Amino acid sequence: MSNYEIPYRKKYTLSIEEAAAYFRIGEGKLRKLVSENPNAEYLLWNGNRVQIKRERFERFVDTLSAI
């Protein structure tokens, strides 16, 4: 298996750090969104580790005028 990086735009889920870079939203703001909305449809939990479903979060952000 070769070691290569998948571009963010092709990933199904993003870590908090990756999502912060991709959406240009601070990690603190993303962590606050996660803690305030732990059952949001754009979140995927693996134990206590959260992943952000990129396309669903894009749709969520599209509905906002400010974050």
Model-flagged regions — what are they?
Residues 2, 6, 16-17, 36-39, ...:
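Generic detection of intrinsically disordered/low-complexity segments and helix-coil linkers/edges
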Residues 22-51, 58, 65:
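Major-groove DNA-recognition helix of helix-turn-helix-type DNA-binding domains
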Residues 8, 54, 58-61:
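Intrinsically disordered, low-complexity segments enriched in glycine/proline and serine/threonine
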Residues 2-29:
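Polyanion-binding surface elements
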Residues 1-3, 63-67:
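Short intrinsically disordered terminal tails
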